[in-house]
Regions:
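PAPS-dependent sulfotransferase catalytic core
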Residues: 1-93, 97
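PAPS-dependent sulfotransferase catalytic domain
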Residues: 87-131
Length: 131
């Protein structure tokens, strides 16, 4: 089972992608297991990541939520796609944040460890800030 984790940067069509996935969930279900923010399936992990990235939460809370998700999809014979744009923390300007994903490396490592020994691909969409 390969796990794909989508962490889109703001204004990169993350919500659009999540809506398309939701609207086509039945058709995709034979090919892909989808854990989608738009269905609130990532809420607890999202909140743990936001708290950790802002310094108000602990890494252990993020690990616990990742472990719950990993258990949920354990044994899946299909690839897994987990999508939520807040896994790497608030965007610049949100909650007074002035840094761009300062703990992304740490959260990425926790993601890889949670789904081990299966491969994890982290998809981080970015955009040209000058536009």
């Amino acid at each position: 089972m390969k796990t794909h984790i989508h962490c889109g940067f703001h204004k990169t069509a993350s919500t659009y992608l999540q809506r398309v996935l939701r609207d086509n969930a039945k058709r995709l279900s034979c090919y892909l297991t989808i854990i989608n923010r738009i269905e609130l399936s990532t809420y607890d992990l999202r909140m743990a990541c936001l708290a950790y990235n802002s310094g108000r939460g602990k890494a252990s809370a993020v690990r616990a939520e990742l472990d719950r998700l990993a258990q949920r999809v354990a044994g899946s014979d299909r690839p897994v796609l987990i999508t939520d744009e807040a896994f790497f923390g608030p965007h610049i300007g949100q909650d007074g944040e002035t840094r761009l994903f300062p703990r992304a490396h740490e959260v990425s490592q926790m993601m890889v460890e949670a789904f081990a020994p299966h491969p994890v691909e982290i998809l981080l969409y970015t955009r040209d800030e000058s536009s």
